[in-house]
Amino acid sequence: MSGLIVIPGKLPGVLLVQPKEFPDKRGFFTESYHAGKYSAAGIPQPFVQDNYSYSLKHVLRGLHTQVKQPQGKLVFVVQGEVFDVAVDIRRGSPTYGQWEGHVLSAANHHQLYVPAGFAHGFVVLSDSALVMYKCTALYNPGDEQGIAWNDPDIGIRWPVPHPVLGDKDAVLPRLRDLPDDRLPSLA
């Protein structure tokens, strides 16, 4: 696809997206999103909500999902650098409990598509980071669920051993402790 490189991740549906950059003496230009190109590349549409978060060094946000209205997310970094993680938590999935992570940064312009039904989180590697993400479903606070960032059964190798956590993220349960009705199903 012209102007867009899409690399399948190790987990089904996870995609690493590398938009083409057009540099010149003034700086550079890149398309951060183009509905037609992204749809043709296999990234589900439509996106119905855009979010951004600003976080300081070593802040870890996650792992988050929605159960009945799962969100696919297209994640990219406008400022700074993060280690971004997707975890398959879909009941019945052959890759249930498996994860993959990628460094996303303002310098590399890489994006990560995290499919609906996956948990998502990131930790900030730079002094601060501005992370933006497009969602395929609207946020519903009554539908949210989280998984412990350091769940030993998942075994994510975070590059920051002692992250800064928000109050809610600090007390999230392990995946094995969630009843089936608090997990997304394999669609």
Predicted regions, residues:
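Short alpha-helical functional segments enriched in proximate histidine and acidic residues
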Residues: G121
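Non-catalytic, conserved peripheral segments adjacent to functional cores
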Residues: M1-H110, S126-S128, C135-A187
